[in-house]
Amino acid sequence: MDYKNKKVLFIDLDSTLIKTISGKTFPEDITDFRVQLPVLDKIIEKMPNLEMFFIVSNQGGLKTLTDKRLFNSKISAIESICASYLRSKLNNLLYADNLYCCSTDKNNTYRKPNTGMLEQLYYNYKYNIDSKDDCIMIGDSSGKPGDFSDSDKRCASRFFIDYIDVRDFLES
């Protein structure tokens, strides 16, 4: 896959872009995360022409309004940290944004593997995107042995964009 021509990145959040500091599957609180710099460094190395960085995440565990407000602060902070880091190394990064889906309903258009989050971001920035050929998604739900699902991979496939598992990306 030719990463150098990719200008638009959709990236999963949990276990892809961040991991918990506690080592637990689910965070203890909104501060229990560490941005995965090896992932950002690999993006810088492989995608020097990146213009757009979009975080897309299923968050079915968010039940209360307070949980959602706190998570919104968390994902905004992560987006800001990542965008600042990437912009310090990449000359072309223009846009960073995020969307997350709190629904556990598998038919919700925004819940991966459905494509609603990608469609919304693509539509919001479409005047700056030449083609879906410029897009790629990185995730950890790839249907590999030990993965809990293949929702990231299926989401990218249904949206007709390239996909790579974060573990494979780090080894590339």
What are these regions (language model features)?
Residues 24-31, 63-75, 108-111, 143-150:
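Short, flexible/disordered intra-domain loops and linkers
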Residues 136-172:
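Acidic, Mg2+-coordinating phosphoryl-transfer loop and its flanking beta/alpha structural elements
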Residues 8, 110-150:
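Conserved Lys-Pro-Asp/Glu-containing loop-to-beta segment of HAD-superfamily phosphomonoesterases
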Residues 3-4, 47-50, 91-96, 128-133:
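Short helix-terminating capping/connector loops at secondary-structure junctions
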Residues 40-77, 95-107, 138-141:
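Substrate-recognition element of Asp-dependent hydrolases with the DxDx(T/V) motif
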Residues 63-90, 115-124:
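Short, electropositive alpha-helical surface patch
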Residues 1-54:
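Active-site neighborhood of HAD-like aspartate-dependent phosphohydrolases
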Residues 105-112, 116, 169-172:
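A short acidic, often aromatic-flanked loop/helix-cap motif at beta-alpha or helix-coil junctions
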